[in-house]
Amino acid sequence: MSQNFFKLLQIPEAFVIDIETLHQNYQSIQKEIHPDRFASFNQEAKMESVKKTAQVNDAYQTLKSPIRRAEYLLELHGLNLHDEKYTAVPQDFLMQQMEWREELETHKDNKSYLEKLAHDIAIKKDEMINLLPRYFEKKEMLPEAIKITRELNFIEKMEQHIHDALIEIH
């Protein structure tokens, strides 16, 4: 079984974390376990170093992203984002998704429009991320954290579609 990412990177298990401390702890641990330090060791020690390095990298990538961190915290609480009881999407967000998709399709060749759309979506994403801390404070609020996290996953996909469209323009 893999170690808890928060424990592995020596930071408190919470949604709000100190990113600088996370980064410093990550770098410090990587220096200790990096495979280059084990070049003269036996094959087993080398493989263990590679395995630990991969786990630390995974932990760091997960915890530095607010959305991945939210998903991980929900998982630690035994909650699955893809559980049927959490898959319903609020009507207003569904309408927003459709509107963004339509705007993307209609303006896929308009760089300035897509940049503005990306900016507007980034603002919405930040607003939603800022809601998450309160939903992780109390266990009974975790279903709301699931809802927000699922919506954030959609927003990330939408951002990627816009990014791809902008690349196509160039």
For the regions a protein language model found, what residue spans apply to each?
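C-terminal accessory/regulatory regions appended to core domains
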Residues: 1-170
